[in-house]
């Protein structure tokens, strides 16, 4: 994986086996998301006491925060099988019927990227979630008939990074909804300490803090950085991941103290040094860094916005005083005023000049 890919929250295919070995097995092992864990614990304990499947669960939030792990934990806590699929994999209603009719009583069905499920399949899911029934249509035209099929009671766990794309009827059928937030540095240090123990890595408190501070609030990124830092410690140090070793390793991989990578810094550098802090249109900024506009908007900007280094206004992108400081520069005298300009409606710019 490239240096820039190190701080991407998206899961790479080759990471599946690695992540599986680090996943928590129960709610007690799951670090962070305290309120979500407490709410889930109460719901699951109540369901076990009644001897019935719990309500359907919708987990939303950015990638890499543990939605898949929680789905696995729900099944484990209930002592039932888990079946996993994703919205893009269900292209036709028939695909969903095949999955639903194969479920055993009490089974947990995990549907990742549920916002991307095909509309015909989504509409079929309504009755399945509410009444544990699907209507299979036989034939076409006026002679078509609907045959109801009863399903075994099950619990659907849906996960989405784009909860705003869910339709109202689908959202309303979830009895339990939870939004997962980014982790703070202390929580990420706990995640790293646990992962280091499972991987047999000697990680000092300072080393954990250093990696946590560069992990963008995301456990997946923290664990990925830990692997690279471990390699450096074994090859160029004494095998112990200390604060100094972590800094040296991540310097090689172009991940700075805030978790910015090469592209992030290139965007900030162009915005500050070439355009005086902005405002500048997205297309112009993308040309300046030699990337597609979509790449800048989808890959770099989300974290720069969250880190308070950049804002989007009706006139274009503007660097904040913190961006100047991060690059070792003094903010311009009028930069505070420019960075407090009204944000663009829906995050859009006027056409770049």
Curated annotation (Swiss-Prot):
What the entry lists under InterPro entries is as follows:
AAA+_ATPase, AAA_lid_4, DNA_helicase_Holl-junc_RuvB, P-loop_NTPase, RuvB-like_N, RuvB_C, WH-like_DNA-bd_sf, WH_DNA-bd_sf
Q: Where is this region: Large ATPase domain (RuvB-L)?
A: 1-183
- Compartment(s) where it occurs, according to its Swiss-Prot or TrEMBL record: Cytoplasm
User: Pfam families in the record, alphabetically?
Assistant: AAA_lid_4 (PF17864), RuvB_C (PF05491), RuvB_N (PF05496)
The entry marks the following residues as binding DNA, namely 312, 317
Q: Which reaction does it catalyse?
A: ATP + H2O = ADP + phosphate + H(+)
Provide the alphabetized UniProt keywords.
Answer: ATP-binding, Cytoplasm, DNA damage, DNA recombination, DNA repair, DNA-binding, Hydrolase, Nucleotide-binding
Name the CDD domains for this protein. AAA (cd00009)
- For region Small ATPAse domain (RuvB-S), the annotated ranges are 184-254
- Name of the top EC class for this enzyme: hydrolase
Gene Ontology MF terms in the entry: ATP binding; ATP hydrolysis activity; four-way junction DNA binding; four-way junction helicase activity
Q: What is its EC number?
A: 3.6.4.-
Q: Which intervals of the chain are annotated as region Head domain (RuvB-H)?
A: 257-353
Residues that bind ATP? 22-23, 64, 67-69, 130-132, 173, 183, 220
Q: Which residues bind Mg(2+)?
A: 68
* Record GO biological process: DNA recombination; DNA repair
Q: Which Gene3D superfamilies does the UniProt record give?
A: 1.10.8.60, P-loop containing nucleotide triphosphate hydrolases (3.40.50.300), Winged helix-like DNA-binding domain superfamily/Winged helix DNA-binding domain (1.10.10.10)
Task: Describe the protein's quaternary organization and the partners it interacts with.
Answer: Homohexamer. Forms an RuvA(8)-RuvB(12)-Holliday junction (HJ) complex. HJ DNA is sandwiched between 2 RuvA tetramers; dsDNA enters through RuvA and exits via RuvB. An RuvB hexamer assembles on each DNA strand where it exits the tetramer. Each RuvB hexamer is contacted by two RuvA subunits (via domain III) on 2 adjacent RuvB subunits; this complex drives branch migration. In the full resolvosome a probable DNA-RuvA(4)-RuvB(12)-RuvC(2) complex forms which resolves the HJ.
Description of its domains:
Has 3 domains, the large (RuvB-L) and small ATPase (RuvB-S) domains and the C-terminal head (RuvB-H) domain. The head domain binds DNA, while the ATPase domains jointly bind ATP, ADP or are empty depending on the state of the subunit in the translocation cycle. During a single DNA translocation step the structure of each domain remains the same, but their relative positions change.
Q: Which family does it belong to?
A: Belongs to the RuvB family.
Q: What does this protein do?
A: The RuvA-RuvB-RuvC complex processes Holliday junction (HJ) DNA during genetic recombination and DNA repair, while the RuvA-RuvB complex plays an important role in the rescue of blocked DNA replication forks via replication fork reversal (RFR). RuvA specifically binds to HJ cruciform DNA, conferring on it an open structure. The RuvB hexamer acts as an ATP-dependent pump, pulling dsDNA into and through the RuvAB complex. RuvB forms 2 homohexamers on either side of HJ DNA bound by 1 or 2 RuvA tetramers; 4 subunits per hexamer contact DNA at a time.
Protein name, entry field: Holliday junction branch migration complex subunit RuvB
From what organism does this protein derive? Parafrankia sp. (strain EAN1pec)
Q: Give me the gene this protein comes from.
A: ruvB
């Amino acid at each position: 994986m490239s240096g820039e890919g190190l701080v991407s929250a998206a899961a790479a295919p080759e990471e599946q086996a690695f992540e599986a070995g680090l996943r928590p097995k129960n709610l007690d092992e799951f670090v962070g998301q305290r309120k979500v864990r407490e709410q889930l614990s109460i719901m699951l304990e109540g369901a076990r006491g009644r001897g019935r499947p719990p309500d359907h669960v919708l987990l939303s939030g950015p990638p890499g925060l543990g939605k898949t792990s929680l789905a696995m934990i729900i099944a484990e806590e209930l002592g039932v099988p888990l079946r996993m699929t994703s919205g893009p994999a269900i292209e036709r209603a028939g695909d969903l019927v095949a999955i639903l009719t194969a479920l055993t009583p009490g089974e947990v069905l995990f549907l990742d990227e549920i916002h991307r499920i095909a509309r015909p399949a989504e509409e079929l899911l309504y009755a399945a979630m509410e009444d544990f029934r699907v209507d299979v249509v036989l034939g076409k035209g006026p002679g078509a008939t609907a045959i109801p099929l009863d399903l075994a009671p099950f619990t659907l766990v849906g996960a989405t990074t784009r909860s705003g794309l869910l339709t109202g009827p689908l959202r309303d059928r979830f009895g339990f909804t939870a939004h997962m937030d980014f982790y703070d540095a202390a929580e990420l240090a706990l995640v790293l300490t646990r992962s280091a123990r499972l991987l047999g890595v000697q990680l000092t408190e300072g080393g954990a803090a250093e990696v946590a501070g560069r992990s963008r609030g995301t456990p997946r990124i923290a664990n990925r950085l830990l692997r690279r830092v471990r390699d450096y410690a074994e090859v160029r140090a004494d095998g112990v991941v200390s604060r100094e070793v972590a800094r040296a390793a991540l310097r090689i991989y172009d991940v700075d103290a805030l978790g910015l990578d090469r592209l992030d810094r290139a965007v900030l550098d162009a915005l500050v040094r070439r355009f005086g802090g902005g405002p500048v249109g997205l297309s112009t900024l993308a040309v300046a860094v030699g990337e597609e506009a979509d790449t800048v908007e989808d890959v770099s900007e989300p974290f720069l916005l969250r880190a308070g280094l950049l804002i989007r206004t009706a006139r274009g992108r503007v660097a904040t005083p913190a961006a100047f400081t991060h690059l070792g520069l003094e903010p311009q005298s009028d930069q505070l005023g420019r960075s407090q300009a009204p944000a663009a409606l829906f995050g859009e710019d006027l056409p770049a000049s």
